[in-house]
Amino acid sequence: MNKFIILALFAVAAASAMPNYPPPPPKPYHAPPPPPHHAHPPPPPPPPAHYGHHAHPAPAPVVHTYPVHAPHAKCGANLLVGCAPSVAHAPCVPLHGHGHGYPAPAPHYRAPESDSFDQFEE
């Protein structure tokens, strides 16, 4: 109990010994002045790190088109080249429908029936 009283007296003495200054007044906020009109732009940011490799310029984009449109195809006849070259008439209208020239999909197979395995059991 004596220790508690001594600690309480010590805390009161320490609190009363501290100076009681008033808090400082808050500083007024002022926005920074705008930059003059002849100010230089900020420098560009440094290039990103390449982890020890030298920086290489990016390649130019590749354009996968022809510089001009293809001429209109004549629908009169096509030259078929083979063992015996010949000329065959080609239609001017493309054929649409019937799967667009692709074969039918592969058929689905049924699962084996259970009685096919019964012949092996005795």
UniProtKB/Swiss-Prot annotation:
Top-level lineage group: Eukaryota
A single GO cellular-component term on record: extracellular space
Keyword Metal-binding: no
Residues in VM domain copies: 69-109
Biased composition (Pro residues): 21-49
Record key words, sorted: Secreted, Signal
Tissue-specific expression: Expressed in the middle and posterior regions of the follicle cells.
The keyword Secreted appears for this protein: yes
Signal peptide: 1-17
Subcellular location per the Swiss-Prot or TrEMBL entry: Secreted
Region feature (Disordered): 21-63, 103-122
Family (UniProt): Belongs to the vitelline membrane protein family.
Name of this protein: Vitelline membrane protein 15a-3
Source organism of this protein record: Aedes aegypti (Yellowfever mosquito)
Source organism phylogeny: Eukaryota, Metazoa, Ecdysozoa, Arthropoda, Hexapoda
